[in-house]
A protein has these predicted regions:
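A short glycine-rich beta-alpha junction/loop motif
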Residues: 25-27, 33, 102-110, 138-166, ...
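Hydrophobic aliphatic residues
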Residues: 17, 128, 203, 226-229, ...
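Amphipathic alpha-helical segments with low aromatic content
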Residues: 1-9, 156-157, 162-218, 344-347, ...
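Short beta-strand/loop turn elements enriched in aromatics
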Residues: 32-53, 234-252
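Non-catalytic DNA-recognition/assembly elements of restriction-modification systems
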Residues: 1-23, 211-232, 352
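A short beta-sheet element
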Residues: 40-42, 51, 57-129, 250-252, ...
Length: 395
């Protein structure tokens, strides 16, 4: 930042922090209410960012009677390191903020620490999640299926910081404001998606109309309105990643941010789907997901069904109708590996408006999707900017 030209200083972790007590409570010993809050390592790894505001009402509480005795409760500026994970996210750190008298314990698989001398609020939370710091931890991690890092090894790392609190404050405040902006952007996206879910229900249950003179919607079975193409898997010898042949859509992994993407091709296609068809994931963890095909022509695997509208229904209306039906369809999924069968799709009872109203409905939801995508792109930009700044602001 302009006006700061002092060199940064570096100290051993062991000279910067003292270690604090943690508990070993499992999730089963936590609840939504209680007198003492608990910071679980799983939440540090996945749920929380670099800074945890203690006013966050999603922080779990310790069930009464399970609290630690003689515990030195955490304070503003304390950090909590997750010492165990399934991958190299070991070492993910949060800094606590706005404790204001709340009783907080550090939980299972965490290393709580207290600075021995002052730092700017939030500086340590951001610094300890930079690649500059985290790369020190990677060679110190131990384990095969599960990775962990010991207090002794954490103590070997170096903590770098500007010499002046003022420069630390500039860095942490700037990143915090950027995080707040990204959080607000996420809430906008969530609100738009919630609105879309409500609008889909209102439209397809005929609670609202897009026609000046509402007309009766006709009752059909889905099988009266579409042709349904099931997929077929290939052995590895029948596909390639050299872009030779026809794109091969293998499953939910081919859906990225609401778009179809291709990473495999085949020279022996048999089960075709075409641009504009609605694809329904019918097997596996992504079962029930719906996407519109953007490639000209593809072969689909068993994980997909392709729905192609006939002359009674527009392809865009088919896409949004299938999206509305997906939860209902998924509830009928069966088998050890969750699966949707053809009969479930074809036998869905649906109501269909005239073609001109179908087009109005599809245009409305298309504009809504465009708005959601624009806000998602804005969030991606904010996240990318933050990532770049995290690399450039710290040395």
């Amino acid at each position: 930042f302009p006006g700061f030209d002092e060199p940064w200083c570096s100290h051993k972790f062991s000279s910067v922090f003292s270690f604090l007590q943690n508990n070993t409570l499992s999730r089963a010993e936590l609840d939504a209410t209680g007198d003492v809050l608990d910071i679980h390592y799983g939440d540090v790894l996945i749920k929380y960012g670099s800074i945890l505001d203690a006013t966050d009402n999603t922080i779990p509480h310790i069930i009464s009677g399970h609290e630690s005795t003689n515990y030195d409760y955490l304070q503003d500026g304390d950090i909590i390191v997750a010492d165990t994970a399934e991958d190299e996210t070991v070492g993910k750190t949060i800094e606590l903020l706005n404790i204001s008298g709340r009783k907080i314990e550090a939980g299972l698989h965490t290393v709580p620490c207290r600075p021995l001398f002052p730092f700017a609020s939030m500086y340590l939370g951001y610094y300890m999640n930079t690649s500059h710091y985290h790369k020190q931890l990677i060679p110190l991690m131990q384990g095969i299926k599960v990775l962990s890092i010991s207090k002794g090894n954490i103590s070997k790392t170096e903590i770098s910081s500007p010499q002046t609190i003022a420069e630390q404050e500039k860095i942490s405040r700037f990143l915090y404001l950027l995080d707040q902006r990204a959080t607000a952007q996420s809430k906008i996206i969530d609100a738009l998606k919630k609105y879309k879910r409500g609008a889909l229900k209102a439209v397809f249950t005929q609670q609202v109309s897009f026609s000046a003179k509402p007309q009766k919607w006709d009752k059909y079975k889905m099988g009266d309105l579409i042709s349904l193409q099931s997929g077929q898997d290939f052995a590895p010898a029948e596909y390639n990643d050299q872009e030779i042949g026809v794109p091969y859509m293998t499953g939910a992994s081919c859906i990225v941010k609401g778009e179809t993407v291709v990473s495999r091709w085949t020279q022996t296609p048999r089960c075709y789907a075409y641009k504009g068809d609605t694809l329904l994931v019918c097997k596996g963890s992504g079962s029930g997901a719906v996407v519109r095909l953007t490639q000209e022509k593809v072969h689909i695997a068993r994980q997909f069904m392709s729905l192609r509208a006939n002359e009674k229904m527009t392809s865009d209306f088919c896409y949004y109708l299938t999206g509305f039906l997906s939860d209902r369809i998924k509830r009928n999924a069966t088998g050890l590996i969750e699966g949707i069968d053809r009969g479930t799709v074809l036998n869905q009872t649906v109501f269909l408006p005239p073609l001109h109203e179908q087009k109005k409905i599809a245009r409305f939801f298309s504009k809504l999707d465009f708005t959601i995508t624009a806000h998602e792109n804005m969030l991606d930009t904010l996240i990318n900017e933050r990532t770049g700044l995290m690399q450039r602001l710290f040395i």
